[in-house]
Curated annotation (Swiss-Prot):
The gene is mutL. Belongs to the DNA mismatch repair MutL/HexB family. This protein is involved in the repair of mismatches in DNA. It is required for dam-dependent methyl-directed DNA mismatch repair. May act as a 'molecular matchmaker', a protein that promotes the formation of a stable complex between two or more DNA-binding proteins in an ATP-dependent manner without itself being part of a final effector complex. It comes from Buchnera aphidicola subsp. Baizongia pistaciae (strain Bp). This is DNA mismatch repair protein MutL. CDD domains: HATPase_MutL-MLH-PMS-like (cd16926), MutL_Trans_MutL (cd03482).
Amino acid sequence: MFIKILPLSTSSYISAGEVICNPASVVKELMENSIDSSATCIHIEIKKGGLQSIVVKDNGCGIDKSDLKASLLHHATSKIYSVCDLNNITTLGFRGEALASISAVSRIILSSCNISSKKVGWSIYSDGFGVISVPKLVVHNKGTICTVLDLFFNRPVRQKTIKSEYSEFLRIDEIVRSLSLSNNKLSVSLRHNDKLIRYYDNCNIDFCNINMLNAIYGLSSVIKVVPVDYFLNTMKITGWLYLLGSYHTSKKKFQYFYINGRIILNRSVHHAVYQAVSEINHYQYSVSYILYLKLNCNELDVNIHPAKKIIKIINIRLIHVFICQAILYSLKKECILKKDCTKIIKNISNNKKKNNLNYNFQSNLDITSCIVQENSYSIPQKLFNLDNVSIIETELKFKRFKCKDYLNTIFGNVLMVIKNFYLLIEKNDELFLFFLPRAKSLICELKLKFGVKNGLLIKKLRKKYFYFFKNNTEYHFFLRFYEILSHVGLNFNITLKYAELNSIPFMIDDTNLGIIISEILYFFKIKREMSLSRLVTTIMNHSKILVKYWDHLQVLSVISECEKYYKSILELNVISYILQPINFDSTVNFFKNDSKV
């Protein structure tokens, strides 16, 4: 797809683009461009709340050399070409105004490498006054890097409206969070003043479970997570409802609703969710949610508002009923019964006498919640009133529910942390110990082997590090193994006399750089070869991944990473390296052989 300037007959039908009024709007536009380019990894670096610099890197399809200049012009886009395309918009952006608006209020450096090029890209520079430089050849990985410098340097009035760095960063943080949640295949990192603030990893598992949200949002009062998965004809809605306690503060509530991957603000859509939940909970619980609705593109009109959050849904009444029905179905499938449990016990006892059911019921059973599941669904006049329950199915099983929700993982149910370094895990009525430090070390090692292209985080050096070549052998070593070094995040600018190190993997401390490079060169002098496994071993020997105290967030991070790389762990046959069964045979034999027992 090539970037073309839209003709007047088409651009006149497009609504005005969003005005760049703060750094958050810059980040929003650049992230949407990255997502539209099919990027799976986006790195965002902010300095001084975005006023000094904003850098957005992605691994998308890139921009061709011939399209670089055109991308900074108004109404230049590759997403639509005619008026007919406005009725079938599948991308987040379509106006071709983002980069042009940003370049008008800042200095911008745009460099990119498309799929056809092999680590050879092109870069252009705009000075903020409409002057665009000639494309220059640069070494570049596949994707695009957009650097925005000195935002509003030529608009002093807008600079005065900026409150503070912290308030602007909070806006950016919310924008990054909302766009990251739009796609679970997207990996996003956010840095502010050279510090890693957020990292949203791409997950194929349920990345919005209750434990993750406890860590991210501090939602300690989540009572129940209700998954939503419902479809009708061409409409489909998925996501999660989070029922919160009535004392839950409104500041920690979150409501994200996405239509075709775009976060939207629509009163009818949000009202449908609240209407369905209120009929079940009778306003006794607050609700937060993350919901994804898929519709045909021709049923939406995105071209009505500059921010593109406010859209027009053609059959809004049908969508309202569909959303309400989907929420009611999900809540009925996993319904939280808030009534007095004695009513349930009384009804069951009565049904036992009527139907002559031959089973023993425990009278002092502690039921804190009950799940009613049905295969079919129809909307009754009075929804799920426990007083009207007259017949309980014989197949219904009651279990003693525990107040604490354990983290359910691929390895089993995580019960507790033992002696600060071990997780006690239960699976299939067996207990296992999960060694946290080894697991973290193993994940770091796998990330190094998979490399930067597969999500390895790198960090820029605060101070420049130069290695001066002692002889031509060292110079040729860096040239020969440049790709394998950059694969693990060791990026060098190589000259005839020295190599300048620009970035390193996240697990390396700056103080160990000299030792690591010396060991790499020493091994090369002896073996005359450098393999990826040897390089990874050298880096891991000098990495700092020791955790003194494993808190809830760190445990969740390691577990989710291990689930992500679970297939690789099985293929390498290193599962026993981090997970071992607990043997109770000696203890049981002791009690059996003890004469006192």
